[in-house]
Amino acid sequence: MSILGDALTDARVLDLFAGSGALGLEALSRGAASASFVELNPPSLHALEQNIAALGVAEVVTVHRADAIRFAERLPPGAFDVVLADPPYTADHAARLVAHFRRNPFGRILSVEHRSDLELDGDSTRRYGDTAITFCHAP
């Protein structure tokens, strides 16, 4: 997360495939103004809601129970400043998300975590063992 640096300051953050909310909650701890979380799995949603309550950040978050790809496909350009995504590695979600961002940049920066052997059409990629993070920037 530190690689995003000042981009998180006062940012509107979207956490796709949020799970427990770790990425979006960390963004808030690093100065983001707000975070929206998108998660479909009920146990993950429960954990997310517990984490939001435990951290006392309910006033600056929104939780959407939705399919993350479909949610992203409905967003207008520039809807968020920073988009964080940690999709399941077993599906093509990362590639679909990057392709959609290239057509419709719904944020200034997209950060997608994925398998390190997967090549995505990003602006830069950092590899850490079996995991990689690809970054895309809006034009």
Regions found by a protein language model. Name each.
Residues 1-139:
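Class I S-adenosyl-L-methionine-dependent methyltransferase catalytic core
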